[in-house]
């Protein structure tokens, strides 16, 4: 039986309460990186402290207790890199191989516009990319191709408009609409 709306709300509320309690130190975090040297990329400073994680989120830095603790004395911790605009399929490797190449260099999140694969395969290409990037150790987010083909002069294997991509908007890793490549059409009000 599917979970009720009230059940979903209650589950989300309990998760948020757990995050707040761990952040405030009222209950142990799920994981604490003890004595980690943190690189503050905004202030250009190094600080040694505990880093608390609850429900998959960093909830605090300071002095924390955790259900699981890892001694990070002498270890450096820094934020992962985010590539805000790529066309993953243009790398000419599978999503799994792409992740093997970028993760060791610190990229933990990418936002991809699957425009090229949509040009060839239409919505099947978008669906493939969503499935092929599921459960990878890099967070792969999507912006939906805004116009396939890119311009009326292009020939492609598919034609996508807002009706074709509408069903993807409910996917949790779809963030919005990608770049408008048909600038001539935009200028002319097409």
Predicted feature residues:
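Short, glycine/acidic-enriched loop or turn micro-motifs at the edges of active sites
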Residues: 43, 86-88, 182
């Amino acid at each position: 039986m599917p979970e009720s709306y009230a059940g979903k709300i209650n589950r989300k509320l309990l998760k948020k309460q757990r995050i707040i309690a761990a952040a405030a130190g009222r209950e142990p975090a799920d994981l604490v990186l003890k004595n980690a040297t943190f690189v503050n990329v905004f202030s250009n400073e190094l600080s040694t402290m505990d880093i608390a994680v609850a429900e998959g989120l960093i909830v605090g830095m300071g002095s924390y207790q955790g259900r699981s603790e890892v001694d990070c004395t002498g270890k450096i911790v820094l934020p992962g890199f985010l590539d805000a605009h790529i066309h993953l399929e243009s790398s000419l490797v599978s999503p799994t191989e792409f992740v093997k190449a970028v993760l060791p260099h610190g990229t933990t999140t990418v936002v991809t516009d699957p425009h090229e694969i949509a040009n060839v395969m239409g919505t099947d290409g978008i669906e493939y990319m969503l499935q092929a990037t599921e459960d990878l150790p890099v967070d792969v987010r999507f912006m939906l191709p805004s116009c396939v083909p890119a311009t009326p002069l292009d020939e492609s294997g598919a034609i996508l408009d807002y009706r074709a991509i509408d069903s993807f908007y409910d996917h949790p890793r779809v963030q919005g609409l990608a770049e408008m490549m048909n600038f001539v059409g935009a200028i002319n009000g097409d």
